[in-house]
């Protein structure tokens, strides 16, 4: 849907919450205006929090706008706010973000987790720079094919390269270029198959 009103969005969320009718339901909103073309605005969040405070408990902010994330944290301290990318994660953490929900966590979970755990450490700014470099490189390629290609290489499992159209897998030359760029910043994905992790 495009060009929907705040009232319409509110009614949509309220209807689902009321029909489920279970206090165990927890809703995490997803603000991704570049893709959805329907923002989750502050007014809508205020209304949902007012009427469903035990249900609407968090938001993933994929606006790519650090100022928007900061304002969400400031306005809604009781809401778990998650930036949708790690590009400005340290700043968001220091302002009160709950963590990060990022596509590149599929390949850089260790780096992101290390930053979250070390947000107050002397090397936190350096850790932020490292994870931001990895993010910049990976997002300069078609993101999902790049991530799946890297997982295929790391796990030695070509099934990870399977992509549904209209997306297309990266060819070997582009995968080598991606790996070379990541090598240049000291990043190497080390992954274990699920059976080895147990």
Predicted regions mapped to residue ranges:
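Glycine/proline-rich, positively charged
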Residues: 1-80
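Structured C-terminal cap/extension of enzyme domains
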Residues: 87-198
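Short glycine/serine/threonine-biased micro-segments
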Residues: 56, 82, 97-100
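A generic "binding-loop/recognition-motif" signal
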Residues: 65, 85-88
């Amino acid at each position: 849907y495009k060009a929907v009103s705040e009232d319409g969005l509110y009614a949509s969320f309220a209807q689902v919450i009321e029909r489920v009718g279970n206090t165990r339901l927890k809703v995490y909103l997803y603000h991704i205006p570049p893709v959805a073309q329907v923002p989750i605005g502050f007014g809508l969040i205020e209304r949902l929090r007012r009427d469903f405070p035990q249900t609407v408990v968090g938001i993933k902010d994929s606006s790519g706008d650090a100022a928007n994330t900061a304002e969400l944290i400031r306005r809604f301290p009781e809401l778990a706010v998650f930036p949708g990318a790690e590009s400005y994660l340290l700043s968001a953490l220091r302002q009160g973000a709950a963590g990060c929900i990022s596509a590149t966590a599929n390949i850089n979970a260790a780096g992101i987790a290390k930053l979250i755990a070390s947000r107050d450490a002397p090397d936190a700014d350096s850790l932020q720079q490292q994870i931001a470099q990895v993010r910049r490189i990976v997002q300069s390629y078609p993101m999902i094919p790049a991530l799946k290609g890297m997982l295929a290489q790391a796990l030695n499992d070509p099934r990870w390269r399977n992509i549904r159209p209209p997306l297309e897998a990266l060819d070997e030359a582009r995968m080598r270029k991606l790996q070379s760029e990541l090598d240049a910043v000291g990043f190497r994905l080390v992954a274990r198959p699920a059976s080895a992790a147990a």
